[in-house]
Every structure is written in C-alpha cells, then in structure tokens.
Amino acid sequence: MSEKIYFEPTWELPNPFYKADGSIMSTKAEWEEKRKAYLELLSEMYYGKMPGRPQTLTASELSNETICQNTVCHKVVRLCAQGEEAPVFFNVHVYRPVMPCEEKLIPVVIPAANTLPGEIISMAAEQGFEICSFEIAEAAPDDKEKIWEGGCAKAYPGYTWRALAMWAWLQSRVIDWLETQKDIDVTKTVVTGHSRMGKAALCCGIYDERAAVVAPAGSGCGGMASMRLSGCRLGENIGLSERIGVMLNKERFPYWLMENVADYGTPDGKNRFRENEIPFDANILGACVAPRRLILVEGLDDDWINPFGTQVSWLAASEVFEFLGVKEHSAIHYREGGHAYTKQDWSVVLDFTKVQLCGKEKTTGYKSMRENENKAGYSWRCPKTNN
C-alpha cells in the first residue's frame, strides 16, 4: 500500500482527510495530493494499471440514418486506437439531434448500450444532448475467458488492468474522438452507465478529468455501494446485498477487478470477512471525482445493489465536495423500483447536468448534502479549510 495513505482498519467508512503522517488536512492542495495517492492505490489494488492515451486514434463512418420520426441522426463510427502491440477496434453509436440547437450539443458518453430505448434517445435530443454509446464485444468482451483475447488485452499485454478499467479506457477514447468533432461542447461531457457499466463509468470519471459529470446508475458493489456497510432501503436485511468476494468469485466475475481485493470479502477460516482492512471504500471512489460533478441515480428496491451502502457512501463522499466548497456538485436521486436505468433516471441525470453546467433551473427532485445532515456509517466530518 502507498506510504502516502494513512489508514487504520475500521468498519467505518475510511476518513479521506488523513495526511500521510496521521494528521488532518486543512487545505485544498493537500486533498489534491491525497487524491493522486488514492489513484495510485486504486491502480495497484483495485482497477489494475491501465494505459494512457493511444499513439493515434482514427475514425471511419460505417452507417448513417435518421430515427425517432426523423428527429435524430444515428450513425455508427468505427474507432481504431493504436496500442503498443496491436490496434484496438470498436464501434461507437452516435445519436445526434437533427434540428440545430441554440448552443453546442452536450455529449453524453455511455458504454455498451447501443440498443437504447427510443424514448431515451428522443428525450436527450429534445434537450440538446448528443448520446454516444459504444460496443465492448470486440475490444473487451464481458467474459472471464474471452476478455483476454480482446483488443485491449492484446494491445497492452504488459498492463494489469481488469475489465472495468478496460471499459473505462474505451469510454475515454470516445471522449478523444469527441474532441475532434464540431458543434460539440466537450467541456460538458457526461460519462454514465448502469450496473456493471455504471462501475466502469465511475472508473472513467475518476481517472479522466475531462468528464465534467460522472453519473453511475445502480452501480452497486465495485461502484458506489460500500464494501463495508450493506442493507436495503432502510438499512434492513444486512448481508442480502452483493459483497466483493461474491462478485469476484471465480465462477462469476473474477475479471472485473484485481483478484486480491476479493480475498477481503471471502471467509478465510480465521476471519469471516475482512473488508474493514481495505484502505478505501466506495466513498473514496466518489470523492476522487471532486471537485467535478457526481450524480447517482438508484432504485429503492434494488436490494442486491445495496441501497443503504450506496447512500452512506455518497454522504461520506460529499464531505470532500463540501471541503472543496462545492457540495452542490454531489447529488443523489432514489426512485421506487428495482434494477434498471429508467426514463426517470435519465431525466434526473440530464437535469442535473443542465443545472450544473448550463445554469438552468432545477426541475427534478435529486438532493445534495444538507446542513446538519444525519450521518451514518462514519463519525468523522469535513474539516475546516485554510483556503
């Protein structure tokens, strides 16, 4: 573990405000140094080390058609990222409003969702958003054996990255391509995704600072749900939600994250569970997005995804946003229902983006951390800053 991370095993959510010597930070510059240390730790212990920007990125258009009653142009673009040992090919599905907008379009980049419902595409287009989704089957297939035969693994064989990091890397390559496009405001890029792709979107948003809004939906374990604390909407049914050891079990998804992190969530004969020994938790993942924007959209009945653990992690992450003077940059929205990325969820993400990046009035009911918020899962608080 990095010597820059001070940590004592605890079942509370880890305190991100400790400096390396165990004292509490008091400046924003100290947080930025701590954030860099966390990024190194996550590469070492969680996501694996991923490569940087490729040597070259080229694009070719495969198809172009109008959909949604001729209101949206859907084109398929094939990207080729030149890796160290081989090229990485993957397709991007672009959904652009046909009618010109008053301002440059805001790009929303989402992974592995080229079959988006028409109502979502239409709603986004009506509000001035361009959606770019991409395919993963060729570059990083979601399979514990095939993924090592995909384009990402072959192009960068010397890296320890796992599936979530590969998908996040592909998401960043879409942003690379967007930077070459006219009529796009790439400074307002949103990265999002649902479930396992929400986990990947969070990873992308942590490492790629071009992501102005990071919007994981129902991301659960490996995303914004705590590895230490779990429960349903009221904190009941502790133990019902997915744990890191279960998720990374060799019969399920051992290729999503680094293998050693699974050991903390797997009984070893001496200790039942050891997630308290992990020097970070989901609140640290969310905090690493700050001071940019973070919005979570969740279902109250999505028990396997750990609604309680997500809520407390979000609150704890919001302490860092408050420390940086931007607590309104962190928000969460719960709806009735289960595991899905619904039209209501999308409406919240788009509204939050317009409020935060375009100065529009808020029209949906997401929340940010309030003054004197009732906290759970941690006893520490945001320290006062000297700048």
Range-by-range predicted roles:
Residues 103-108, 127-130, 186-188, 209-213, ...:
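Loop/turn elements at helix/coil->beta-strand transitions in domains of secreted/extracellular proteins
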Residues 104-180, 220-230:
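Cap/lid segment of the alpha/beta-hydrolase catalytic domain
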Residues 92-100, 176-178, 265, 269:
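Aromatic-residue-lined binding/catalytic grooves and analogous aromatic/hydrophobic interfacial grooves
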Residues 116-118, 139-142, 198-200, 221-226, ...:
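Flexible loop/turn segments at secondary-structure boundaries
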Residues 1-91, 96-101, 209, 258, ...:
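Alpha/beta-hydrolase-fold serine-hydrolase catalytic core, especially in secreted/extracellular enzymes
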Residues 173-243, 274-277:
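Primarily recognizes the serine-hydrolase "nucleophile elbow" in alpha/beta-hydrolase
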Residues 134, 192-194, 216-217, 297-299, ...:
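Generic beta-strand/beta-sheet core signal
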Residues 216-285, 306-314, 322-326:
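Mobile cap/lid helix-loop segments that gate and shape the active-site cleft of serine hydrolases
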